[in-house]
């Protein structure tokens, strides 16, 4: 996907997202226009559109509306059915779990189960696990625009989401092998539910859903960034207190502790980064990004990765943190997924109403499925590292 033919797909995907950003700026500039204010004023459209809230979140709204239109026209269903058919025939998975895995490539982990709504109640535990792992291992198309804003390659993001879908099915079957008899359903014959009655209503429904998603993202980022800062301050304070008692009564050679959440994440996930093939010099920062992705969410991880790529992150000594291009590519794949602790509750809350009597199964599978999604993303990252430079 990345190399054939000569990177045309990557260039096309990157150009597509760049074009979308330009179209969104037209609508955003009109909404946030302030004609009576001088150029360069903080409320000037061009200044506002450089911020996350006014420059990126409108892209989510537009993309959600566009996806809804494509869904109404039947193009989304055609693409999802095609991918589901390939996975069902090559991997031997059931129709519902193949269909959900294919849908996860394009939509979110709470929207994908709606594609197989009539079948969720009768799914086996192995199929339920596959449904959840697939959601944790991929990202939605609407969120790709946000990560592109951070400087992440749209081509790599799309490739990561595509190859993580079958990888998620493989990991899911390893974690929860099929011991029951799944209901025989052909993925191609499954008809996703159609809501809109015309293309205008489809655009309106998509825009409305996009607004809800944008507001949710805004609140989540504000809360999680504030909580992360609070936790970091607590860890640093504990480190300073520990350092004081260790050095109490010592003469010279004082212990200098640099405790922080970043250092904690780095130490915990350093081995995983090394196993993925990241060179030792980048394992510390890669482990930190993996930790933030799992403990907090992928937004924070990609945001910091973008700042590292721009040379805006400094280490404890005041030196600019860097990473090699190969590490950047591997981490793009490793971070591409909803596998974090908060997403467990979101996914259970999204799938639960479709099959209330399966809530206990969903709760039991939640943590395992989240780690399965993380492993699937890391597995695709390993493949990206192997293929890098070919």
Language-model segments: which ranges?
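N-terminal alpha-helical transmembrane segments of multi-pass membrane transport
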Residues: 1-53, 201-204, 221-227, 350, ...
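Cytosolic juxtamembrane amphipathic/interface segments immediately preceding
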Residues: 38-48, 87-88, 112-121, 193-211
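Juxtamembrane inter-helical linkers in multi-pass membrane proteins
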Residues: 80-115, 182-202, 244-251, 261-267, ...
